[in-house]
Amino acid sequence: MKSLKSRLRRQDVPGPASSGAAAASAHAADWNKYDDRLMKAAERGDVEKVTSILAKKGVNPGKLDVEGRSVFHVVTSKGNLECLNAILIHGVDITTSDTAGRNALHLAAKYGHALCLQKLLQYNCPTEHADLQGRTALHDAAMADCPSSIQLLCDHGASVNAKDVDGRTPLVLATQMSRPTICQLLIDRGADVNSRDKQNRTALMLGCEYGCRDAVEVLIKNGADISLLDALGHDSSYYARIGDNLDILTLLKTASENTNKGRELWKKGPSLQQRNLTHMQDEVNVKSHQREHQNIQDLEIENEDLKERLRKIQQEQRILLDKVNGLQLQLNEEVMVADDLESEREKLKSLLAAKEKQHEESLRTIEALKNRFKYFESDHLGSGSHFSNRKEDMLLKQGQMYMADSQCTSPGIPAHMQSRSMLRPLELSLPSQTSYSENEILKKELEAMRTFCESAKQDRLKLQNELAHKVAECKALALECERVKEDSDEQIKQLEDALKDVQKRMYESEGKVKQMQTHFLALKEHLTSEAASGNHRLTEELKDQLKDLKVKYEGASAEVGKLRNQIKQNEMIVEEFKRDEGKLIEENKRLQKELSMCEMEREKKGRKVTEMEGQAKELSAKLALSIPAEKFENMKSSLSNEVNEKAKKLVEMEREHEKSLSEIRQLKRELENVKAKLAQHVKPEEHEQVKSRLEQKSGELGKKITELTLKNQTLQKEIEKVYLDNKLLKEQAHNLTIEMKNHYVPLKVSEDMKKSHDAIIDDLNRKLLDVTQKYTEKKLEMEKLLLENDSLSKDVSRLETVFVPPEKHEKEIIALKSNIVELKKQLSELKKKCGEDQEKIHALTSENTNLKKMMSNQYVPVKTHEEVKMTLNDTLAKTNRELLDVKKKFEDINQEFVKIKDKNEILKRNLENTQNQIKAEYISLAEHEAKMSSLSQSMRKVQDSNAEILANYRKGQEEIVTLHAEIKAQKKELDTIQECIKVKYAPIVSFEECERKFKATEKELKDQLSEQTQKYSVSEEEVKKNKQENDKLKKEIFTLQKDLRDKTVLIEKSHEMERALSRKTDELNKQLKDLSQKYTEVKNVKEKLVEENAKQTSEILAVQNLLQKQHVPLEQVEALKKSLNGTIENLKEELKSMQRCYEKEQQTVTKLHQLLENQKNSSVPLAEHLQIKEAFEKEVGIIKASLREKEEESQNKMEEVSKLQSEVQNTKQALKKLETREVVDLSKYKATKSDLETQISSLNEKLANLNRKYEEVCEEVLHAKKKEISAKDEKELLHFSIEQEIKDQKERCDKSLTTITELQRRIQESAKQIEAKDNKITELLNDVERLKQALNGLSQLTYTSGNPTKRQSQLIDTLQHQVKSLEQQLADADRQHQEVIAIYRTHLLSAAQGHMDEDVQEALLQIIQMRQGLVC
């Protein structure tokens, strides 16, 4: 609804320029699916979706669609601040305009979204941009009655007196829209009160014309000129008279009187002053000097008091205005929502009215058809009386006239106010009803009115009870709303407390930053003092240390950023997969529901068809009884001929049926072969179970993938730590610094993850295609069912039209005879095709001729006349009925025969196609086994080569581990030596700190060991699970292999298998290449590590020689060595045990991988197997259903043929008995026949009367049901509307609670991040203290040895440059910090000015997001 309103608003705007249209068309041409998704997400306000789509390449949120609007414009017009933040962070041209020339600032000002406007102004959006009407954003804000947006625009330099195309300023538009507060605000900001448009009209004139009293009053108070004239010579009083507003006229009169009095006083003033001056000069000169001083002091005091009061009042007014603006925005949004709901209600009402009209029209047509049906039945059953026909014609005509009159009359008129002709339409046409007097009619009407009033009273009581119930519910809802408000107030208080805590932490962080500054200044002074007496070598070492620290920090930050990006990408991919799975599940459920609905509808339609067939049979029986007596003999001979001919046809049909059965048997055999191939088809229940298991497995695999990714990340981190340790060793050795900078670790885990995710996406796409195919097949089945329903309805209507009165019966008989002739021609054509069965047909024709000769005798024996009379009558009636049934069945059989032929032809074609495919696409088992054996040999060779490479790789890894262990041992020995040096030359405090650090490292190592043991237990459990799953898969694969050995293999499967194997071989080759590369890399690393080890040993020896020269105490060194060696040995033993466990796990994993690969090579993938299974199951089900239907039809036909044969034999026996006996005259026979027919006609008349009475009773019952249903529908609509309102209110409450919980969660996260930042600051302070200690130690060394002055000057220069760079970094950090604090304070001030509304919550969310970004 909102999108429709926005479109209508755009259509109301005057036509844009050609350039805007051309741009829109150009952008619309480039519009793609991502732009459409982005537009839908922006309209829904889905921030996550918007950010995910913006992350893709080539997405531009400023692109215009066909309607000339962009995503950026939609977000700003709806006031969605989070989406707008996402778009602005992504990057967009802020000055982009739509087809009306409006940019985002115009739209934010037009719809009163002050926060969006503030955000756009922060991104330097121009305020002077004008649309095609020449209006700026200030014009739109003045029209939208949004004072906060006007204040923001004016603060950012928007021109208050800007004019549009018509020359109107924002003040003119505000007065025209009757916005007095905005008029006052604009005047305070410097708006010209007397500015004129192109017709020289002022704001006062337009306010008088449109009757805006408050705005006119504000203008007059602020000095608007009343006497100005426009281009036509009219003043403001003329416009006030046009507006017919007496209050404005009185205001103008008072203002004009005040101005006239002032002018008169100004004119008279000089003469009076001259007179007074002449008389009073002497008196005033003495006292003036005394009083002036006191008056000036008093006035100054009063001015200061008034100024303070004015300031307070202005502040209070601003606060109140902000509150009022917030409330107005909320009211506007609620009004929009209410308007949308009302429009939707009106649409639903209109739809309900249209459906009720359609229902009434259908009921009327049903009643008319029933009347016609009665009319036709009376024509058939009656003996041709004209009176009854005319009477029913009159009834039908009067019913139609009554329907037309009821449609013409208005629904508002009650039933008792209508005319008697409307209430009693038959009263005018029937002269037999004149006996009723008018008094009796009036009494009946009064009784009807009383019943109507009583029903109305009952309805009124029911409605009152329902209203009371709803009032109670509303009260309960009001109580709940109050409770929710109280809860929200408490949560708001908690949020305010949290804000205060955040402020405190910000201040503490500022203090820590200041401490850092002081530390750096102290360092600077210390360095400058030591530079005067320092060494060149020491300065170089300090430089190296600083560079190393910078490199470490930069590398760590880059690696952390990479890891974060990888984690975010993985989370996005997992979320997308979850959404896709949910969508697929929902689509599956929806399709299952549609299937159940279709089956229900099919069953209902089948029941209706059976009922209609029963009715048709009853009507055919009635028609069979309504044949006249005179034409019985002619019909007898013709029917006997037809019976004989149909017997022949039945014989031919039986032969054709046998042929079709033989073909069906062949098809069954082929189907059995196909079934043998697909013996393992699954039932739908089992399929669902398997599907659920697979979904569980997929979920478990997803979890395993996430765990593996975490393990990979941990391994990467450990590798990175090892390389960092190597770098530290290189820095100490001074020789390998340049070489280690060029070596980096390759990150290939992301590529493997991408490949796995691509495979999963392909599987999901295949599933989607299968679901869509099923959906299309179900749609086709639905269309077929609808066509069958239409054909059945047409057959029913055809049967209704077939029952014709006896006058037209002869014509129909002639038409039937012509049809019979045509059928004979068709049968003659079929006879030509069936030449083999002519002998049996000739025998049957000879027998029929003999029967005809025997029936030609016109006399019956006397003795058995009375006994045979009843039997003949019964048999004749039965034969007539059965013949009619046989006619219908014969026609149905012909149609079905044609259909069966078509199906047989289709099946033959399919068989031929399948045979051709089998010849072209099938391979013998020998060839397939030869190919499989060759492939298995190649796979074994590849696996053997892989095993060798893996063995080499493991050996290389073991050697690397040993080298790492040796490097660690050497490193620890160097650490012990350094600690000894520090103990000798440094104080005891540093030695204690080292011991503490060593204990902390021991604790960390123990924790890591415990974590690794836990991981090992988890991995063992996973291995067990994998073994169980592999056992299950093995069993399934063995069963599949047993089934596949007995069956032929399709070329498609073999091709697919070959492709899969080729792919796998390619993948294995790639893995071989990768492993070989890794092996070479490992060798290179090994050689480098050996070289490093040699160099480090040489360095250690050099250090030991130095230590020997310098007398070190051996007791401390030996104690430290013992303690360190003990801990190192323990750690080595634990590491070795862990490595052994890890190698065992790797061996088990490789074995499992090999088993899986063998199973994959020897089996078909499950997805393909399931797809083929489903396709064959569908085909088999369809063929089974068709075969069952054909078998049932053939059984019915065989039963009918057997019945006919038994009847023919009975007739033959009766004829033989008649020949042996004597013959009686036909006159008696005819007399008895006429008596029986008269009895039958009388019974038919009675039946017709009973049917009429039954139908009248049914009509009365239907009318009563319709009234009850209409009353129930109205009640249900009321209930539904009230429940919807209740649900909407509950949803709003839930949304507010969710936003509050999100705020709490984000505040907690920000607190955690602030703590992390504090920890980092403390770590930096510790590093600074360590540097100080190192410098102090070096300063002692520098005092012993002296150097020349040139080196000292160079050292001083370099140190000064370093200090300057550090100062610049500190200044930049301070600036960023102060900018953040400024933004934070502005948001806090906006929160402190009013309550915690939605806007303030959004601002707090923005602050928390910025804090997160700064911490990161």
UniProtKB/Swiss-Prot annotation:
The modification N-acetylmethionine is found at M1. Signal peptide: none annotated. It is found in: Nucleus; Cytoplasm; Cytoplasm, Cytoskeleton. One of its GO terms (molecular function) is actin binding. ANK repeats lie at residues 38-66, 67-96, 100-129, 133-162, 166-195, 199-228. Gene3D superfamilies: Ankyrin repeat-containing domain. Transmembrane segments: none annotated. Disulfide bonds: none annotated. Residues 1-24 are annotated as: Disordered. One of its GO terms (cellular component) is extracellular region. It comes from the Eukaryota. Keywords: Acetylation, ANK repeat, Coiled coil, Cytoplasm, Cytoskeleton, Isopeptide bond, Nucleus, Repeat, Ubl conjugation. It holds the Pfam family Ank_3. Induction: Up-regulated after TSH stimulation. Residues 286-374, 438-1386 form a coiled coil. There is a cross-link at K1035 (Glycyl lysine isopeptide (Lys-Gly) (interchain with G-Cter in SUMO2)). Highly expressed in skeletal muscle, heart, kidney and pancreas. Expressed in choroid, retina and epidermal melanocytes. Expressed in eye muscles and thyroid follicular cells. InterPro entries: Ankyrin_rpt (IPR002110), Ankyrin_rpt-contain_sf (IPR036770), RAI14/UACA (IPR042420), T_SNARE_dom (IPR000727). Regulates APAF1 expression and plays an important role in the regulation of stress-induced apoptosis. Promotes apoptosis by regulating three pathways, apoptosome up-regulation, LGALS3/galectin-3 down-regulation and NF-kappa-B inactivation. Regulates the redistribution of APAF1 into the nucleus after proapoptotic stress. Down-regulates the expression of LGALS3 by inhibiting NFKB1. PANTHER family: ANKYCORBIN, UVEAL AUTOANTIGEN WITH COILED-COIL DOMAINS AND ANKYRIN REPEATS. Component of the apoptosome complex, composed of APAF1, pro-caspase-9 and UACA. In the complex, it probably interacts directly with APAF1. Interacts with LGALS3, ARF6 and ACTB. Interacts with RAB39A. This is Uveal autoantigen with coiled-coil domains and ankyrin repeats. It comes from Homo sapiens. The lineage of its organism: Eukaryota, Metazoa, Chordata, Craniata, Vertebrata.
